[in-house]
Amino acid sequence: FQAEDGIRDRSPSRGLGDVYKRQIAYFLKGIVSFQNRNTIYDFNEKPNQGIRGARNWIKSHLDKWSDQPGADLFSCEFEFDYLMCNRTRHSQLLSIIPGHGPLRKELVILEAHLDSRCESLCDTICLAEGADDNGSGSALLMEISRNLCLFSLSRTIVILWVTGEEQGLGGSRSFATFCKQNAIPIKAVFNNDIVGGIECGKTSSPPSCPGPYQYDSTRLRLFSSGVTNSMSKNLARLSKLIIDDASKDSSFHLPQIDVMFGEDRSGRGSDHIPFRELGYSAVRFTSSYEHGDGNPNQPDYTDRQHSSRDILGQDINGDGILDSFYVDFNYLRNNTLVNAISAVNAASSTFDPYKLQLIPDVNSLVVKIENPQNALEYIIGIRKINSAYFDTIIFSKFPEITINDLNASTYYVTAAGRDSNGWIGMFGQEYNARILSNTNNLSFASPVELLQNRPNPFDELTLIPIIINDPQFVKNAQLEIYTESGHPIKFIKLDLKTGLNEILYDYQWNNYN
């Protein structure tokens, strides 16, 4: 592969190797060549066909890389029982890059589902290349394995080619359950599902794209659960911070990371969710634009997602060689680097989450880190209640700072530390402080506060915050939502607790009769 096709991260604190567009293209072409990778197209007597053939082909590359001088990588298969398409026994492939030192038993997981599907969920005969969904994520994992096998990291990296995503997340749920039952600590989970396409379809699951023949190769969506005091959301915020930071110091073009409010697109899901359900920090990367909403049974569905049309590309001039691709290899290469940087940071940072003391005053706030751990730099993230990402980020050499000229509001504050190698620890608990504009504001707060929803306007989810200052005033609570004309949309029974309560409103509730 020619050197000009590679990208080298020149940031000395990262030390990441080359990520090659041509290498990724080769991997993706190999994966789609198996034509149908349905979860149940997996037979001992057909080792070179279906999803078993794809697993064996990937493993042959892992074995080759593990034989390199200085490489530290081994692969294995995880067998599990989970009923999918009338079959119970399944298998999925892992590559493992062992950690070194006292944190080596903690895992950082990179995952992507290898299985594909066409219009029929359990069809093993149809053409189901699954080029973007999810050959793109599977090829991304191969390139990361090739690069990181020469790294020596504090935590162990597990790279998981999941099976059964299309049939209900069976593979990821089984592996997450295995980790939980065996008390295996997991620092972070990075899921990649549909990460190579840049074209919007006629349909797409919101929040997504404006319509057909629209393209975006500059942004990457990052989904995670929760908003306030969510470790998954904090992992998403940290990933954006790291990528924004790397973009300033690098000659290559990383995508802009959009931290989304929801855990996934409306009505959709993927393999990060079972890990989050069991208490692990887990996020999902997915393309800014998608070609389809994954529902091929609807009338006049012509998009590629979940259909036999999810192919690598077209031969326009009839010479037998694809020359128009539905997966953008530059975009997929950049998304591969996003994952490599995020995963290596998670596997390298050693700081414990910070505990904070907040001292509010009139138009000001003192933030004190109680366990600073001698960081080279302290990073304080501040946001208002309605923001998914930080509104303000402060970089300081000192573990105690005073922030002046604040508007009267409630602020949520968290912090992380950067070590001498540039790695950043996980953001810890969010602490809140109410800032007053003058001493006349010291009157008692209302027992219940219903705050403005954000984002507003919205096209998918919006967050409705409710603050309970005095729980004795609340017995039975219900949130009632109406149209401007008074038509009822949704009544939601609320179980409110003292402090902040967050309700995510789904745009689909507007589809009343």
Predicted segments with their positions:
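Short, small-residue-biased leader/transition segments that mark boundaries at the very start
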Residues: A3-Y20, G417
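A non-catalytic alpha/beta surface segment that caps or lines the substrate-entry region
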Residues: Y26-P98
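Active-site-adjacent mobile loop/cap segments within catalytic or ligand-binding domains
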Residues: V32, V195-Q214, M260-T350
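Alpha-helical metal-binding/catalytic segments enriched in His/Glu/Asp
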Residues: L110, D115-S116, L121-L169, N339
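Metal-dependent peptidase/peptidase-like ectodomains
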Residues: V162-L278, A282
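Glycine-centered coil/turn sites that cap beta-strands in beta-rich domains
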Residues: V366-K368, N440-T483, F491-L494, L500-N510
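Beta-strand-rich modules
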Residues: I403-I424
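Extracellular fibronectin type III
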Residues: S420-N438
